[in-house]
Amino acid sequence: MSIYVGNLSYDVSEADLTAVFAEYGSVKRVQLPTDRETGRMRGFGFVELEADAEETAAIEALDGAEWMGRDLKVNKAKPRENRSGGGSFGGGRKSYGGSRY
């Protein structure tokens, strides 16, 4: 399982997030996505702890807590959805009949 951490300060680092979550257990991984074009932090991240019980304790303690001047949103991360499905933009044209000419 992974934890979603939202409403993060744009100044936060992986080390900052690791330090906060280390109070609840052994941090396996921290991920802070950045904007592809600007390289700037996107204001959210993901943290993975060693055990589910540690993650549950961290979620309960930190959801709504103020940190770096912001109220954190902390919950179980949802599995990433496949972006290729759904509405295609012009890619699925239907052909009715034969040649245009």
From Swiss-Prot:
Q: A single Pfam family, by name?
A: RRM_1
Q: Which domain of life is it from?
A: Bacteria
Family matches, as InterPro entries: Nucleotide-bd_a/b_plait_sf, RBD_domain_sf, RRM_dom, SLIRP/GR-RBP-like
Q: Which residues cross the membrane?
A: none
Sequence ranges of Basic and acidic residues compositional bias = 73-83
Biased composition (Gly residues) is annotated at 84-101
Q: Which UniProt keywords apply?
A: RNA-binding
- Name it: Putative RNA-binding protein RbpA
Q: From what organism does this protein derive?
A: Synechocystis sp. (strain ATCC 27184 / PCC 6803 / Kazusa)
